[in-house]
């Protein structure tokens, strides 16, 4: 059985928005972030400003997917990426031109789903990362980058 690391801190964990300059940076940051938030010994209060912003996207997720976000998140078929993507797309007005609010909601939903509760550990974070890669396109990453760079946090 693994034991808690002294610190599990990806390179963007304590970063600011200034550390994101390209679509590749955003992809890398989101990958690290999902891994970080799904790590069972993560102390979310230790997150830096960028990760705190990403964590706050759960509020956007509740606005788009409903106030019972945890239940909605638990009901998604994360192990069936295609079905999961199709269900999430039902909440998006225009899949090819997602708004910043919709993108934040998707990240917030993924955050809620990735959080490990109790001592249960699974590999859902892999499914979440695959779903993100499938649902987000190049324009979405640019919109998200612009939103992060202009956000006040």
Curated annotation (Swiss-Prot):
One Pfam entry name: Poxv_Bcl-2-like
Disulfide bond entries: none
Protein name: Protein OPG005
Organism: Monkeypox virus
């Amino acid at each position: 059985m693994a034991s808690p690391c002294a610190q599990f801190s990806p390179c963007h964990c304590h970063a600011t928005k200034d550390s994101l300059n390209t679509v590749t940076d955003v992809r890398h940051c989101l990958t690290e972030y999902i891994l970080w938030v799904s790590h069972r010994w993560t102390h979310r209060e230790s997150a830096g400003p960028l990760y705190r912003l990403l964590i706050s996207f759960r509020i956007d997720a509740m606005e788009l997917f409903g106030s019972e976000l945890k239940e909605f998140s638990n009901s998604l078929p994360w192990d069936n990426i295609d079905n999961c993507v199709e269900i999430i797309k039902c909440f998006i007005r225009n899949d090819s031109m997602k708004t910043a609010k919709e993108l934040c909601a998707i990240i917030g939903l993924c955050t809620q789903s990735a959080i490990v509760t109790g001592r249960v550990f699974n590999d859902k974070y892999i499914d979440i990362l695959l779903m993100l890669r499938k649902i987000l396109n190049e324009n979405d990453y640019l919109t998200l980058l612009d939103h992060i760079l202009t956000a006040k946090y």
